[in-house]
């Protein structure tokens, strides 16, 4: 139980606590008198966000990785998207091995599409088709989809849809 007594600029705070024993604790607190300058409204300062969007994506990806694990029977299909390229890997997390991979840097995809502004939805569909064919050749039919913290729309959605159309089960 805390009580405040005093007048003017000095107050005495008495604290009786059973947690600290039955003794009383006193401490003096010096209070400032009200001034007109402290009551004036202050201008609102808008501060920048502390995290960037890429840091937010990495945080989302770490939360996803806690839930999505690749096994030998059902490896993880991991997607990484940069401004210029799109990368996909099928990973067995128990053995820490990459079983299959596809990217826009591979010759069949890069020669077929002449893109200068980065991967488009059509390019993402082609990468999904290539990874699905590569997985089916190696006997992998079921995968756990790891979108890498990216929203499930646009290139990520097109890649997943193309992989499903060509035989991969998510």
Swiss-Prot record:
Q: Where in the cell is it found?
A: Plastid, Chloroplast
InterPro entries recorded: Ribosomal_uL18_bac-type, Ribosomal_uL18_bac/euk
Query: Ribosomal protein: is it a keyword of this entry?
Result: yes
What the entry lists under Pfam families is as follows:
Ribosomal_L18p
As one GO molecular function, the record gives: structural constituent of ribosome
What GO biological process, any one, is recorded here? Answer: translation
Main location group: plastid
Keywords carried by this UniProt record = Chloroplast, Plastid, Ribonucleoprotein, Ribosomal protein, RNA-binding, rRNA-binding, Transit peptide
Gene Ontology CC: chloroplast; chloroplast envelope; chloroplast stroma; cytoplasm; nucleolus; nucleus; ribonucleoprotein complex; ribosome
Q: Which domain of life is it from?
A: Eukaryota
- Mind telling me where the transit peptide is? 1-47
Cite the record's note on assembly: Part of the 50S ribosomal subunit; contacts the 5S rRNA.
The family annotation for this protein states: Belongs to the universal ribosomal protein uL18 family.
Q: Which PANTHER family match?
A: 39S RIBOSOMAL PROTEIN L18, MITOCHONDRIAL, LARGE RIBOSOMAL SUBUNIT PROTEIN UL18M
What is the role of this chain?
Answer: Binds 5S rRNA, forms part of the central protuberance of the 50S subunit.
What's the protein called, per UniProt? Large ribosomal subunit protein uL18c
Where does this protein come from, organism-wise?
Answer: Arabidopsis thaliana (Mouse-ear cress)
